[in-house]
Amino acid sequence: MDIKFEGNDAECTAGLKKASEGSFVLKDHVLIEFKINGKVAGKIKTPCEGVVTFGKGLKPGIVLNKGQVIATVSECTHAIVIKDMCATCGKDLREKGGRAGQRKEQSTANVSMIHHVPELIVSDTLAKEIGSADENNLITNRKLVLLVDLDQTIIHTSDKPMTVDTENHKDITKYNLHSRVYTTKLRPHTTEFLNKMSNMYEMHIVTYGQRQYAHRIAQILDPDARLFEQRILSRDELFSAQHKTNNLKALFPCGDNLVVIIDDRSDVWMYSEALIQIKPYRFFKEVGDINAPKNSKEQMPVQIEDDAHEDKVLEEIERVLTNIHDKYYEKHDLRGSEEVLLDVKEVIKEERHKVLDGCVIVFSGIVPMGEKLERTDIYRLCTQFGAVIVPDVTDDVTHVVGARYGTQKVYQANRLNKFVVTVQWVYACVEKWLKADENLFQLTKESTPPVGRPLGSKYVNDLANMDTIGKAALADMNNEVDEALSDDEDDGDNEDEDDDGNDVGEDKGDENLEEKQEKNEEEMDDVEQNGSVENQSGDALENETDSTSRGQKRKHCPEMEDEEEESDSDNEDDDTPMSYKALLSDSRKKGRIVPENEDDAVFDVDDEKGHAPANIDEEEDDEDNEDEEVPESDDDDEFEDMAALIERQISDAVDEKDQ
């Protein structure tokens, strides 16, 4: 509803406003006074309740004309809401008995702009007004925005019990939080880095640590609240448990054109072009990022880094960020004031691309087999920093990045006088944003594969350095496997029985004989009545031997038990060993691993036909048991001795009855 000035015969001027712009007023609330000859002559009141919006150009002292719109009173749109209560009109928007967010009335507020007060949300229109004012303020002060991660970027925190002399180590702080003792170590050069960056950047903390933890670290880094103030975004305010990018639109509703990020991990920022990824800082032994999101790729370090005290990463990053700031405002000054605001990501991309510009790189043994080159981090890093990746060594290639010496690509590169370097050369270029000296990272016969993943690369040492297998070696392996598969299936059973020694085997045999003797004595009564003692004993022995043989086969291959019970003839068809190619194909289909060394090749196969070669992984145990292995002939002798013993026992029993 528009409120207009009714006019007066005399000249009237506007007095002081009695309400603020955008405020909620009740009916008959005084909006403004008007004067005649410098004295208050009347007041203009609201005919209803609502939100006040004053007319343009209305200010004290101006002449009021009849019919002029003084203000507009409209219904509250609830543009500012905190905990489901409108901050403008004070109305409770939550349903009775409802949970947070369950409102009985619609609201235009949906943007959370305050770092540490996520419950305070504003409308899109108001958010853009605030964001635009913030941008103008930054440009006026010639600053950019810097989002700073905490853990393993500028600090390292441990929750392990330890004794630390904090008096002699001023950069180490111990404190209690959530009934636990934490120890935090500042990365070398952190204080100087933050102080210098504050002159060029408006700094914000963005961390996966909890709110109390984040604010406690901020007190350590910025005790006067001068660098970060209250611009602290913790896990409690983040919209996603896996990514930090979702909050950027809320924090910067007009766009992230001025935002630069430093973090030790790129995945949580979805590999944003605004990210300056830095080497993780690890000081405490066997402690990674205690606040890393679940299911993340973060890996625990095995040892404390020897150069933890000599870390100079922040000095390099300070140089990079200073250069980005200067380049941005150089380009900004050349643009017209009416043009769209320059995006700092364009400057970052351009400066990053200069590092390896002109480099044509071939990888040798770096990318694991079966993985697409374009999806690896080593490929992403090289291309981001300006290199071109090609598959083969040609005259245009400048570098071969290899994992081991002696490959064909390395040989070709040496023959063409190309740089042959280790993967550490790439990491050194990425970490410092400078092209490193190739002579310091030459790949030689003495070079060792890299340990760890400095910038989160998916470089897999074990798979990437598998030795190649020649045709002769494959032929030898084929023969060895065929011979192993052609051995009698009972060999494996003999090894299992003889592992405990011959004495144990004899004891078990005696126990079995006693049981059989008792059984045969019971059968003797029946046999004697039928008058066929000898035939019955022979049949019992034959059944016993056949049952023992079937038991051995079932023990060797349990999954064939049911089939063998149904038909013994099926086993005769299954005795044909698998060929080497079929065996290898079956192993690959079932996900079994073929190791890199020929001598250590393991084919852990237990196929449907019951063929199971000896496990070479247990080579040491097999060597110990070689002397105790029982040959096949011993099995036959054992059965013959057993049969003879049973016959003698039966014969003695018959003689005793006759007597």
Swiss-Prot record:
Cellular localisation: Nucleus
SUPFAM superfamilies: BRCT domain, HAD-like
Effects seen without this gene: RNAi-mediated knockdown causes an arrest at the 100-cell embryonic stage. In developing oocytes, results in an abnormal accumulation of 'Ser-5' phosphorylated ama-1 and a more diffused nuclear localization of phosphorylated ama-1. 'Ser-2' phosphorylated ama-1 is present in diakinetic oocyte but at low levels indicating that transcription is possibly blocked at the elongation stage. Increased levels of 'Ser-2' phosphorylated ama-1 in embryonic and germline nuclei.
UniProt keywords, alphabetically: Differentiation, Hydrolase, Nucleus, Oogenesis, Protein phosphatase
Polar residues bias (residue ranges): 529-538
FCP1 homology domain span: 139-303
Spans annotated as Disordered: 484-640
Catalytically driven reaction(s): O-phospho-L-seryl-[protein] + H2O = L-seryl-[protein] + phosphate; O-phospho-L-threonyl-[protein] + H2O = L-threonyl-[protein] + phosphate
Pfam family, one: BRCT
Function: During the late stages of oogenesis, dephosphorylates 'Ser-5' of the heptad repeats YSPTSPS in the C-terminal domain of the largest RNA polymerase II subunit ama-1. Similarly, dephosphorylates 'Ser-5' of ama-1 in early embryonic cells prior to the activation of the zygotic transcription program at the 4-cell embryonic stage. May dephosphorylate 'Ser-2' of the ama-1 heptad repeats YSPTSPS in embryonic somatic and germline cells.
UniProt xrefs under NCBIfam families: FCP1_euk (TIGR02250)
Protein's name in the database: RNA polymerase II subunit A C-terminal domain phosphatase
Originating species: Caenorhabditis elegans
